[in-house]
């Protein structure tokens, strides 16, 4: 049970998305991130921007969590691992793929199929850091045009993996997709995702936080609470009932990164 954020009544699963910002200051924030994860007590955490400094979290949190997709199949570093509570779940399968359309190899998605050790229920989590085009990439392309096209393909790539998992485990497999999508709620890529999955902020039955700008620029910088919306999302399919959708923006939450964590409390149908 979380010390800071008690679970909603009836919660079966708490899932978080967390971009930890891999700038040089990460080495100083690793202990803060570890403490925050312990306090939030999520069952599954989809992470982004986990460089080699950030992998220290795997050892620090090893008493409670196991990491999936620390590397890609070819042995190269994966920046989008998934953490899961090994006391509750067994890993059925997992892996990762670089996004087909990207500027750097930091943009990928990972996946994990987990089984509840007590109930035998299986569910899948996919986790992405979607494409963005920045000036430093020195590409003859814009983030608004080509970048959005890339992000649209990133979404399609994840939906292809989701469909593969449906074929293997059945159409009733609960699926959650976490991540930094680098797109606002009205972006084309998010619109595409919403045609196939539900934004947890839209379907939460008890409470939600829709308008908090989940990206806030620098660790410790207060968030804008309206007028921009999030770029970090958790999407679910019909077999996941979302109770609460949360974008914490208190001092502890904004200190760990330039992104607020996003988490949901949910049940699996």
Per-region residue spans from a language model:
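Active-site metal-binding loops of divalent metal-dependent hydrolases
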Residues: 18-20, 130, 179-181, 260
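Acidic/histidine-rich helix-loop elements
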Residues: 12-31, 72, 100-103, 131-150
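N-terminal, active-site-proximal structural segment of metallo-dependent hydrolase catalytic domains
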Residues: 1-61, 72, 76-78, 121, ...
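Structured beta-strand-rich core segments of catalytic domains in phosphoester-bond hydrolases
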Residues: 44-134, 246
């Amino acid at each position: 049970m979380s010390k800071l954020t008690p679970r909603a009544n009836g919660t079966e699963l708490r899932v978080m998305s967390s971009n930890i910002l891999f700038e040089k200051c990460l080495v100083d924030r690793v202990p803060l991130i570890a403490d925050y994860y312990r306090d939030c007590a999520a069952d599954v955490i989809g992470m982004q921007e986990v460089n080699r400094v950030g992998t220290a979290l795997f050892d620090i949190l090893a008493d409670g969590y196991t990491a999936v997709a620390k590397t890609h199949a070819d042995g190269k570093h994966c920046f989008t691992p998934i953490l899961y509570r090994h006391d509750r779940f067994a890993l059925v399968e997992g892996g990762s793929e670089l996004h087909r359309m990207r500027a750097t190899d930091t943009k990928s998605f990972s996946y994990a199929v987990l089984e509840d050790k007590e109930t035998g229920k299986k569910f899948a989590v996919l986790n992405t850091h979607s494409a963005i085009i920045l000036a430093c990439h020195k590409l003859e392309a814009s983030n608004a045009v080509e970048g959005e096209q890339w992000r649209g393909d990133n979404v399609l790539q994840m939906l292809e993996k989701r469909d593969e998992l449906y074929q293997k485990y059945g159409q009733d497999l609960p699926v959650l997709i976490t991540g930094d999508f680098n797109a606002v709620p009205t972006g084309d890529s998010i619109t595409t995702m919403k045609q196939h999955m539900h934004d947890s902020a839209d379907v939460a039955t008890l409470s939600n936080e829709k308008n908090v700008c989940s990206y806030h620029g620098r660790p410790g910088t207060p968030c804008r609470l309206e007028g921009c919306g999030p770029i970090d999302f958790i999407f679910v399919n019909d077999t996941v009932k979302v109770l609460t959708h949360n974008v914490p923006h208190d001092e502890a939450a904004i200190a760990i990164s330039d992104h607020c964590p996003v988490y949901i409390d949910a049940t699996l149908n």
